[in-house]
Curated annotation (Swiss-Prot):
Pathway: Sesquiterpene biosynthesis; trichothecene biosynthesis. GO terms for molecular function: trichodiene synthase activity. Gene3D superfamilies: Farnesyl Diphosphate Synthase. This is Trichodiene synthase. Keywords: Lyase. It is an enzyme of class 4 (lyase). The keyword Aminoacyl-tRNA synthetase does not apply. Transmembrane segments: none annotated. It catalyses: (2E,6E)-farnesyl diphosphate = trichodiene + diphosphate. InterPro entries: Isoprenoid_synthase_dom_sf (IPR008949), TRI5_ascomyc (IPR010458), Trichodiene_synth (IPR024652).
Amino acid sequence: MENFPTEYFLNTSVRLLEYIRYRDSNYTREERIENLHYAYNKAAHHFAQPRQQQMLKVDPKRLQASLQTIVGMVVYSWAKVSKECMADLSIHYTYTLVLDDSSDDPHPAMLNYFDDLQAGREQSHPWWALVNEHFPNVLRHFGPFCSLNLIRSTMDFFEGCWIEQYNFGGFPGSDDYPQFLRRMNGLGHCVGASLWPKDLFDERKNFLEITTAVAQMENWMVWVNDLMSFYKEFDDERDQISLVKNFVTCHEITLDEALEKLTQETLHSSKQMVAVFADKDPQVMDTIECFMHGYVTWHLCDARYRLHEIYEKVKDQDTEDAKKFCKFFEQAANVGAVAPSEWAYPQVAQLANVRAKDDMKEAQKPILSSIELVE
């Protein structure tokens, strides 16, 4: 295994944060904790339901970790939407993370997908059955155009996860494959469209800005995620089908060249994102900027990405990039480093156990006859 290119990663991260003029001021600490707990609490009760527990069959610790990660992402990034919208999006995106971590073959359960869809029957695939049940709670926040993007992008995501089941990084020379797969499983259109709830934006009035935001967010969001995930995925056997690794295979280039390709595309996308919306509707620009800054804060602070390890490694170094990275990291930590114990309670497993005990008590109650009830 090659050594992780720490200096290159620092330089790239610093340039990204400078390009977007990173300065997360989305919340006070109290507001952040309040929104985190609200979204988490509703989502935790959702996943503690017997139907969800039975059909998902996810390890409780993994489900808990997935939920905490997603609630952080949504609350930090969707800073302008209502708490109710945050909670419903948290549930939806937790479902996507659960699917992303799954290793089940979807083929058997997808044989009758369209027939069931057309007939209005419940889907055979348990993930689709649960996601479809929750979708109305998500879509009620959005107009028809944004809703269609959410539905379509979620379908693309499912297909992308299906492809990833084969651990296939593409054939050498298939230059379009890496970006095809990343767009498919990146949820870029779902994210881009879910920034514009109908209680804040008239999608007809802001149609051009929203359409452009969906187009731009498709790449920016996934490329930033790939860049900020590069460290945690570098030596993880489960994360070898990544955009960077697929660049190596399909473009037949070195890992350094693949990382440089991702870097240049991410930085270019960041420049575009800022420039395109600079003179547009101020509310649109504010929403996009809050998302970008919150999304970066989430990556820097969430334990899933292990970027605190980079910070600890370089905090005593005297290079310019190390100093800048540490300054940005500390800036993010000051606003976004909130211990899960402050907001992620009670745990899903605890709620599920309480529900199971309550159901058992109900089942054990004596059944009175109609005569006894009259008496």
